[in-house]
Curated annotation (Swiss-Prot):
Major place of residence: cytoplasm
Family classification: Belongs to the UvrC family.
Signal peptide range in chain numbering: none
Record Pfam families: GIY-YIG, HHH_5, UVR, UvrC_RNaseH, UvrC_RNaseH_dom
UniProt xrefs under Gene3D superfamilies: 5' to 3' exonuclease, C-terminal subdomain, GIY-YIG endonuclease, UVR domain, UvrC, RNAse H endonuclease domain
UniProt name for this protein: UvrABC system protein C
The keyword DNA repair is annotated on this UniProt entry: yes
Length: 608
């Protein structure tokens, strides 16, 4: 007999207010399983407990409710915002969840005598102009590379710029005009290039080309043939870029979303147009509860997408579906953006062209996602069969260790769920206080740091893979011997064969250390190889980053009279270790807090 008390909906509804607000539903474990908002709380919550409820999702949800609570707000707009905040906080299983709600990157043009172009993500605190948002950091990097080939504008940090006494490699490659060194470019000529770059970022390519043609003709008339050739090369490079861009005619600022949804998988494709230019696209796969409708999935996505931090809301949003509460959402986003925001569904002409493209991409992405999931599902099923699992494997983790001759050791922990890599739960550990090269001690420390504070059973893996042989596996066995949780992972060591070739791994079970026979073409082995390779990659990239950071500071750490603050000041002012190595004694003495005498000491130390 169950010792849980059934939720008394009648008693709860009796005193429920008719005001707008947000409601939260909890199960018997006190987990929030659903968050909703309502213009009228009493009417909305009552609808869940009617005798005739057609939705299978709602029926399943209601059966699990142990208790509810509500938060009353002043308006429907406040309810939208609070609902979104609660969904981000609790990640309820019956809500549609946007997995990627981070801010998007911009191209930043600084407010400086000689402005720089840079990648920017986060709050817009620095003075300057921001262009975007771009769909990914890759899109920003590609745009900056393209601009560097066309406009010789610096992309270096201000500290590096200040420390220069001679031009860097970018000047030699003709990718920077060298404003850091007096006499290489006049302020007027540099500003002219900045103005052209600004027009380019605003999508005014024709005006840029017209201006460059005028400059080229003027330079040719004045017999400045070298300058004329540079303008000619700029025009040629710009024409090549323009051939590759799909330029919008009159859509200065617009987001367009395509949508496809089948068998519990939703694919949403966003196209982002700014300043008459398609900046790029991005695929989204929100986590969708069973039996969710198209409208529910898409509206939840739109709200979570635009209410996430540091999002720029465009004037026009083109959607494939009518939103259930479109008027209220338009009003909310208008208030958030501080200007009028409009949704378009019955799109025509250019908007229709973009919408068709977005829908086609969403459909193609959905087909690819379904194929990927079928492949992953088959691999999991095969592994469950081999290991005789009675329940589906929901979570697997794998550990690996990376170091160089025992120094700067880094341990990695990667996580896979039924959909493949779950990168939000990846972790790295910088290993300290062990004998250099002692991989067993490194593994023991990593395991202890990863699992000592685990409270949620869902964060405990069903299978824990250890990249290594019996010695590494023994460390995991020792750690879990006194494990206090009811759920305990199955421990498996993944030992490389003598040739270290894929397909020749030995899988070792904890306890009796029996090996698991798997053929090289086994799809279950392919899944294990995937998680092992991912843990290896994650460990190596972490170790390389740590090694690179150590290189930057190790040469400075042994200099007499140079502590942590002065090291940071040197690195910041000189733009990194290379800047310090190339600096003269007098340039080092210009760093705040560094005397001429100390500058001599620093110079002698790093050059001897």
């Amino acid at each position: 007999m169950s010792d849980t008390i059934e939720f008394d909906s009648k008693a709860f509804l009796k005193d429920l207010t008719n005001q707008p607000g947000v409601y939260r539903m909890y199960n018997h474990k006190q987990d929030v399983i659903y968050v909703g908002k309502a213009k009228n709380l009493k009417n909305r919550v009552s609808s869940y407990f009617r005798s005739q409820v057609d939705s299978i999702k709602t029926q399943s949800l209601v059966k699990q409710i142990a208790h509810m609570d509500v938060t009353v707000v002043h308006s429907e707009a406040e309810a939208f915002i609070l609902e979104n905040n609660f969904i981000k906080k609790y990640k309820p299983r019956y809500n549609v969840l946007l997995r990627d709600d981070k801010s998007y990157p911009f191209i930043f043009l600084s407010d400086h005598q000689h402005p720089r172009l840079a990648n920017h993500r986060g709050p817009k605190k620095r003075k300057g102009e921001y262009f975007g948002p771009y769909p990914s950091a890759w899109a920003v990097r590609e745009s900056l590379r393209t601009m560097q080939r066309i406009f010789p504008i610096r992309q270096c940090e201000d500290s590096y710029y200040r420390a220069r006494s001679r031009p860097c490699l970018q000047y030699q490659l003709q990718r920077c005009a060298g404003p850091c060194v007096e006499g290489l470019v006049s302020d007027e000529d540099y500003q002219a290039q900045v103005d052209l770059a600004r027009m380019f970022l605003k999508g005014k390519n024709k005006q840029v080309i017209d201006s460059l043609v005028q400059h080229m003709e003027r330079a040719s008339t004045d017999l400045r043939f070298e300058a004329a050739a540079r303008y000619r090369d700029q025009i040629s490079a710009l024409n090549k870029v323009q051939e590759q861009q799909w330029v919008s005619g009159n859509q200065e600022e617009m987001d367009v979303f395509g949508f496809a949804y089948r068998n519990g998988i939703a694919s949403i494709q966003g196209l982002f147009i700014r300043d008459n230019k398609l900046l790029g696209s991005k695929s989204f796969y929100p986590k969708v509860p069973a039996e969710a409708t198209d409208e529910e999935v898409f509206q939840s996505f739109i709200l979570q997408f635009y209410l996430a931090g540091n999002k720029v809301i465009p004037k026009q949003i083109v959607t494939p579906l009518e939103l259930n509460e479109q008027g209220a959402i338009e009003e909310l986003l208008t208030k958030e953006a501080g200007r009028r925001i409009q949704f378009y569904r019955g799109a025509r002409d250019e908007k229709r062209r973009y919408l068709d493209l977005a829908n086609t991409n969403a459909e193609n992405a959905l087909i690819a996602k379904q194929g990927q999931q079928k492949s992953v599902f088959a691999r999991y099923t095969e592994l469950e069969k081999i290991l005789e699992f009675e329940q589906p494997i929901q979570r697997m983790e794998c550990f690996d260790i990376s170091h160089t001759s025992g120094q700067l050791t880094v341990a990695s922990c990667v996580v896979f769920n039924r959909e493949g890599p779950f990168k939000a739960d990846y972790r790295r550990f910088n290993i300290e206080g062990i004998t250099p090269g002692d991989d067993y001690a490194a593994m023991a420390q990593a395991l202890a740091r990863r699992y000592r504070d685990v409270k949620d059973d869902s964060k405990i893996p069903d299978i824990l893979f250890i990249d290594g042989g019996k010695g590494q596996l023994t460390q995991a066995e020792d750690y879990f011997e006194d494990w206090k949780h009811e759920k305990k992972p199955l421990l498996i060591g993944v030992a490389k064969g003598s040739s270290r070739k894929a397909g020749l791994e030995t899988l070792i079970l904890a306890g009796n250390h029996a090996t698991i026979p798997l053929s090289g073409d086994s799809i279950a082995l392919h899944l294990i190889q995937h998680i092992r390779d991912e843990s290896h990659r994650f460990a190596i990239t972490g170790h390389r980053a740590r090694r690179q950071k150590d290189k930057k500071t190790s040469k400075l750490e042994s200099i007499p009279g140079v502590g942590a603050k002065r090291r940071q000041s040197l690195l910041k002012y000189m733009g990194g270790l290379q800047g310090i190595l190339q600096a003269s004694r007098s340039e080092i003495a210009n760093v705040p807090g560094i005397s001429a005498e100390l500058a001599d000491t620093i110079y002698d130390h790093i050059h001897n």
